[in-house]
Amino acid sequence: MGSDTLDQPIFAIGTIIEDLEIIQTLSISINGQVYLAKDINTFQLYAIKSLRHIDSASLHQNFQLNEILLHSRLSGHPHVIRIERVIQNSDWTHIVIEYGSEGDLFTAIVDNNIYYGNHSLIRHVFLQLIETVRFCHSKGIYHRDLKPENILVFDRGHTLKLADFGLATADCYSKDYGCGSTFYFSPECQGGFLIDSQMGYATAPNDVWSLGVILINLSTGRNPWHIASLEDKTYCAFLRDPDLLLKMLPISSELNRIIKRIFCLDPLKRITLDELYLRVQHCIHFTRTEEVTQYESMVLKAVQLKNAQVYSKSTDDLPTPPDTPDITYSPCINQGSSSSFMGTGLLQKVALFPKMEKEI
């Protein structure tokens, strides 16, 4: 076994742990290390998630034990990453899990562009996610960190499997405010909205909110805002005008109606998973097809003209300004037209919305 410091790999390539040979280091972070391993008998590939025992009495250690326990209760579901076994020693716990060779949903959306404009595929995989989260909730488990990085892709993007239960809880209500990822957690999870000081926030509606952001990711490749907070100007603009996303992104009216039900500020009135499943099942178009085609054409022309002054930066990477402009007074919003996405300022409108990026 190699170094045992937090920022160095604990396994050298070629190390064998039980009957698994380490063949690649996949990631190293403060939360743990992930390796690719091969069974020396069957040649089957697995991922090994290694968690350091920092302090047996610490909150961190409790989260580790909780992750294994809750994930194990869900492991048999076809859309949950399977736990094969758990290997423990005095300093580390190694969770051997199913390996997804196609990577995560973030990569599929951002790098491989699998879903953009593909209505049937978006519907197919998002229904899988709803059904999987519904299964988790039926078992009394709430993920609290739903995001594309925690969803693995199989079958060339047609099958999704939920992973990483490190922040999951069995509590229907939680006072762990700020638990999750800023792009994806709900307003009430931040402790800034509708706080019940006795109970905390409801964890099931918080998961539903995260699913809504993922649905925007799948449909547009963008995040709707940096954080659902009054400090975020884009989110504040959405609170003032619930049709903002329809006017600024190439989403369909059908999707807009669903999104408004998901992003209901009151978690008790937020759409349920059962209703969400039915609405998505009957949603024909997630984006406005003609406008998407025109948008792609404009992006192509922008790339070809990237040396011109107006396209001084390649629009392959539509930048989000450091400070999002006050959208309320932006002249590019046509309050009277649901199709105001198109026309002058199209690229600038899309650029107002945060690019998808991984949170460390």
Features from the language model and the residues they span:
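Conserved short submotifs of the Hanks-type protein kinase catalytic core
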Residues: S90-D104, A108
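Activation segment signature within eukaryotic-like protein kinase domains
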Residues: V125-F126
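Catalytic-loop of the protein kinase fold
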Residues: H137-F154
